[in-house]
Amino acid sequence: SAASDVYKRQGWTGYSWNTELFKDYKSFLNNLQNRNLKVTLNLHPADGIRHFEDMYNDVAKAVGIDPETKEDVKFSCKSDDFWNAYFDKVHKPYEKDGVDFWWIDWQQGKKSDIEGLDPLLALNHYHFLDNAENGKLPLILSRYAGLGSHRYPLGFSGDTAINHKVLDFQPYFTANAANAAYFWWSHDIGGHHFGYKDDELYLRWIEFGVFSPILRLHSTSNDLLGKEPWKYRRDVYLSAKKWLNFRHRLIAYIFTMDYKCHKNGTPLCKPMYYAYPNEESAFNVPNEYFFGSELIAAPITSKTNKKTNMATAKAWIPKGTYTDIFTLQKYHGPMDITLNRELYDIPVLAKEGAIIPLSNDDGNSSANPKALEFWIFNGNNSFTLYEDNGRVNFEKHNAKTKILNTFDEKSRKIKLTIKAPFGDCEVIPSGRKYKITFKEIESADVKLNKEFTISNSDSALSIEVDFSSDDIEIELTNIKLIKMPDYKERVINSMSRWQEQTSKKTAYYKPFKNAQTREELLKVLRISKLPKEIKNLLYEQLITD
């Protein structure tokens, strides 16, 4: 009956728009495109094309079925007629209307009408090739179809429950997938269904998502499970907004890392033991991973401790000096450590000399940034920024910009060179402006071979200069480093935030009162009977510069 047909069309599987919800879906898609938003639609092809679909008549005729019979057009891997109709009659018209790529959500097993062929792998293959038409870089979103699926990015890890256990698993899952060459996982950030409402859990999930291959907020169809930041308490909303904006700023860094992955097979997220296979500690931190060439991330997946108002992440610091890009704390490895952070922070550590390109453009465009900022950390390093035209011929139409960073600690002198871009510089937006922020420098004498202005960014020295087709050379002397709180002040601040009876806190603090140096404070800490969570917090404060 007509009524039952409408009911089926409103169900889970189908290829026709619900016109009660989208009265003019073409205008809706056009509006999204005008907002610089890309569109993907969720597919469940297992039931084929049924008689109540808008395009059924055309599909049925194409495969030799009389539409009057209302016979289902069954999904088939071996029928050329089916594949041609599937793309030409079902998907391509919607692509002309504004759909950019497809989310392939096959969940009906690995058997098809071709023995040994997983239908999801076949769908991935054909959709990926089809999406490359007209010069586009091909993209799909899909469930995992087994080994070899890494050829068809990107991945969808499935419907997850909303709880801390699932969040705790995902950083390990994401980094560990590098062992199967599956680098581009995406998760339902915030969780998909079931579980419980927890604003803290939501924000921690977003923080992890910012430092994962793909950030994709999603939930099941439930009015009470929306993942929009404004549906959470105000402090969480403001922090989520900050993190989502920062993720967009990372577009230049992540794009460069994804190009390196394409060329060299180096994953954006990789386990610590990839670089340190002989270090036992590198195998004992499953939730810590390299995020590109410059950063290490250790997402916090545990609940906030009510005594410290902080949550923790287990981490291992490799040999060398690593600086938290947000708190500027310096960690000297190798060492095992428990990292403590407030709800609004995630531990992300930069290697010595790290160079991190960030977009300074307003809005949500995915184009190469017109305003580009470089975060510079003290040390010796080089970094090559990659940009292209976003088309399949990108190997011919790309530009690379090399940045050299040298730091002479003894003379307190920094030299930074932004080399002249090489390649197809037409992909670089005209009128580009650079902002170079030395994250650990408060002030310095600046020498530059171009006109420039000096500004301060969160107390750090920033230099602004126009793009140049020649080398830009910056030299800093008489450097004044940003001063961190002294160690006694750190002890006082940490113990002040301790949620405990004043008399008890005062008694524990008494032995620290007469200690002045870091060594004296650490000695008191070692013999103190403080609760473990407070000792961990104080230890981190005392061993970092």
Regions inferred by a protein language model and the residue ranges of each:
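Hydrophobic residues embedded in beta-strands of well-ordered beta-sheets
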Residues: 295-296, 412-416, 461
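Surface-exposed loop/edge segments in extracytoplasmic proteins
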Residues: 323, 329-332, 444-453
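Solvent-exposed loop and beta-edge segments used for protein-protein assembly and interaction
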Residues: 31-35, 291, 307, 366-368, ...
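Residues that cap or initiate secondary-structure elements
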Residues: 47, 146, 278-280, 303, ...
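A surface-exposed beta-strand-loop module
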Residues: 455-473
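Catalytic-domain carbohydrate-binding cleft regions of carbohydrate-active enzymes
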Residues: 1-345, 350-351, 530, 534-545
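Ordered hydrophobic segments in well-structured contexts
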Residues: 153-155, 290, 296-298, 338-340, ...
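Accessory, solvent-exposed terminal regions and/or long lumenal/extracellular loops of proteins
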Residues: 352-450, 477-545
